[in-house]
């Protein structure tokens, strides 16, 4: 995947997570106060009225945006750090998902305010897991190993 495609997908994931927030989350969130100060609440109110026919699940409302944003961060960092050594790229790209995982685990242990949610933990973990699998497949040419093994065994 090229850096440009990674960036585009990353920006689309940010947009999708943002649209979920704008469409369905309570307007008491800090985001809406900022949008109100920018004079955008009339537009947002109209958008929310149009979207009111839809009733997404709690997973979509509360867990999915974090996972989308974690995945977006990974993709954008990978696109911006193309000439950086692989270990540094992975370390930087892992920061946000690891922070999300840590915050959920600390909530579970009662060491951080908030409510532990296993689906939030899953949504932060999956993008990181996909990153690791992607790096293994791309950089260690694992598919070549499998195809070579199948040719040798025949």
Language model region names:
Residues 1-154:
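Bulky hydrophobic segments
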């Amino acid at each position: 995947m090229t850096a440009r495609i990674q960036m585009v997908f990353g920006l689309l994931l940010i947009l999708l997570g943002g649209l979920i927030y704008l469409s369905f989350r309570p307007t008491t969130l800090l985001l809406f106060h900022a949008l109100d100060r920018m004079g955008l609440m009339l537009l947002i109110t109209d958008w929310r009225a149009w979207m009111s026919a839809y009733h997404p699940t709690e997973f979509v409302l509360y867990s999915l945006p974090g996972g989308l944003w974690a995945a977006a961060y990974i993709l954008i960092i990978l696109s911006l750090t193309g000439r950086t050594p692989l270990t540094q790229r992975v370390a930087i790209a892992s920061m946000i998902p690891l922070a999300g995982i840590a915050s959920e685990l600390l909530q579970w242990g009662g060491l951080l305010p908030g409510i532990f949610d296993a689906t939030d933990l899953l949504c932060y973990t999956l993008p990181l897991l996909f990153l690791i699998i992607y790096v293994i497949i791309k950089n260690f040419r694992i598919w070549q190993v499998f195809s070579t093994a199948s040719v040798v065994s025949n």
